[in-house]
């Protein structure tokens, strides 16, 4: 039996999900299956599919108008957990559900670009696309291209009766709770909301019967409780429960033979600038890239990394992860901002800033260089990171002040309009597209919270989404990174480690090496006990 130490709401999300149930959440790799899956290096292989579409073949056609058609062939004799056949019609039905606006997935990738999904026969799935989409051959392998099937034999009538009403189809249907039926390596036996999920191995799993017979997922909302359970041997696997310093403590308490810590250096950190002129502080950080570059040179990222990551993070000058294919090219072409107070001084002076006799900087408008730096409440590490950066900038003569933002009591609008600099998870270059700027029109949703806009980056991001040639994808990644590192909508800090812990005699969990590695439990069917 495996017992997971996970946040309290995980158990509820595992089955109820955020909009369409387990299909779009972390447990997809435990309770459901997809067309394709990625390994720890981001390499894609068939899952429910017997084969994946190949570019420039009959299975992946690109038409002159930019639309596409992909064809997946399913493995024969697939079944759901209840023994009923899983066919291409289940994907057709899933698409009909996901594109219903009330369910909240109709504008998400890849659903937003699917114009039709058809099943010429029980094993063939033909998808028409409104535009090019690079991941059209690997649906289900990543969170950004999820398209899991739904059991038509269980849900079609309920979906029809609901008339497309999410209020009727989702919370009122037992399928989304204790009645969940999927096609993943484990099938649901019992569900105690917010407390636990019990599951057993699925004999007919597409990749072979799991080697461990039973899995128990426990809800935990306290890190100390989770650590005690792991040390005592009551829990055998903890997914992303611990911060770096807590991982060190757990490693020490375990001793040399007590358990295994997987340090996954994929969590990225940034300092993002506010670009809305009426909210920028000071204004010059929104209007002059030289000022932003000066701040970047004034920050000692290595010192912040060393203090926060407990020695298990990863530094990179370009923001590109060293395990990405385009890393060597990015290292050659993308701007770097090493800690260099002299260069920071030069850039500030070029931008019209003046340093007073007291060592403090004044803006070109002869106002004090007051700079609020925000962090999210609830994390000691984020607070520690913030304190380090604030102290560094103060020593350089900037009137930096620590500010805390509480996501529980504040709105998306308030977060989007924060002045100064906001610490957070680093955005990939394509996520600075102007369509991701939070506005009143989109209810203040979107990851480009600082409101950065660059037409050339938008153009490259649009091309990136539609690129299918591997060489073109590499080139676009580097070109987007070059713009972001030059114009500097954010300061990339470092990669910190997510901590995954498991018992010493549990074999099979693997570190993810790139962002495109899929879920941490993607290979749970291969895990086994070493007696």
Model regions: which residues?
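Short, well-ordered beta-strand segments
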Residues: 1-4, 372-374
């Amino acid at each position: 039996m495996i017992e997971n130490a996970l946040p309290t709401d995980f158990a509820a999300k595992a089955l109820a999900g955020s909009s369409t149930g387990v299909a779009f959440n972390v447990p997809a790799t435990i309770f459901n299956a997809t067309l394709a899956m990625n390994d720890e290096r981001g390499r894609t292989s068939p899952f429910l599919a017997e084969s994946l579409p190949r570019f420039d073949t009959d299975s992946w056609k690109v038409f002159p108008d930019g639309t596409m058609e992909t064809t997946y062939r399913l493995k024969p004799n697939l079944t759901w957990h209840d023994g009923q056949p899983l066919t291409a019609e289940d994907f057709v039905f899933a698409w009909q559900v996901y594109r219903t606006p009330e369910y909240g997935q109709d504008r998400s990738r890849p659903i937003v670009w699917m114009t039709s999904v058809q099943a010429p026969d029980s094993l063939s799935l033909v998808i028409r696309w409104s535009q090019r989409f690079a991941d059209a051959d690997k649906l289900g392998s990543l969170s950004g291209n999820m398209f899991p099937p739904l059991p038509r034999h269980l849900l079609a009538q309920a979906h029809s009766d609901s008339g497309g009403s999410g209020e009727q189809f989702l919370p009122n249907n037992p399928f989304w709770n204790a009645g969940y039926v999927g096609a993943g390596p484990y099938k649901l036996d019992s569900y105690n909301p917010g407390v636990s999920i019990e599951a057993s191995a699925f004999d007919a799993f597409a990749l072979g019967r799991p080697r461990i017979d039973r899995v128990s997922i426990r809800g935990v909302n306290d890190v100390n409780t989770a650590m005690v359970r792991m040390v005592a041997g009551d829990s055998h696997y903890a997914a992303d429960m611990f911060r770096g310093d807590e991982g060190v403590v757990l490693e020490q308490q375990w001793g040399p033979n007590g358990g295994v810590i997987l340090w996954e250096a994929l969590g990225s950190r940034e300092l993002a600038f506010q670009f809305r002129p009426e909210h920028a502080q000071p204004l010059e950080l929104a209007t002059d890239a030289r000022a932003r570059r000066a701040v970047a040179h004034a920050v000692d990222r290595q010192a912040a990394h060393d203090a926060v990551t407990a020695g298990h993070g990863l530094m990179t000058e370009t923001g590109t992860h060293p395990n990405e294919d385009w890393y060597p090219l990015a290292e050659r072409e993308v701007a770097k901002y090493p800690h260099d107070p002299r260069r920071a001084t030069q850039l500030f002076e070029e931008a019209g800033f003046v340093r007073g006799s007291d060592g403090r900087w004044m803006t070109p408008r002869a106002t004090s260089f007051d700079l609020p730096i925000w962090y999210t409440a609830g994390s000691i590490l984020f607070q520690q990171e913030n304190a380090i950066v604030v102290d560094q900038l103060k020593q350089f003569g900037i009137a930096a002040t620590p500010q805390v933002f509480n996501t529980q009591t504040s709105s998306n609008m308030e977060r989007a309009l924060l002045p100064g600099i906001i610490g957070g998870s680093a955005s990939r270059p394509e996520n600075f597209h102007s369509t991701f700027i939070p506005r009143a029109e989109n209810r203040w949703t979107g990851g480009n919270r600082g409101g950065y806009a660059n037409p050339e980056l938008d153009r490259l991001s649009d091309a990136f989404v539609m690129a299918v040639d591997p060489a073109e994808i590499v080139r676009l990644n580097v070109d987007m990174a070059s713009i972001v590192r030059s114009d500097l909508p954010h300061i990339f800090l470092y990669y910190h480690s997510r901590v995954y812990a498991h018992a010493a005699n549990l074999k099979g969990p693997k570190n993810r090496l790139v962002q495109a590695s899929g879920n941490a439990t993607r290979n749970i069917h291969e895990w086994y006990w070493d007696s």
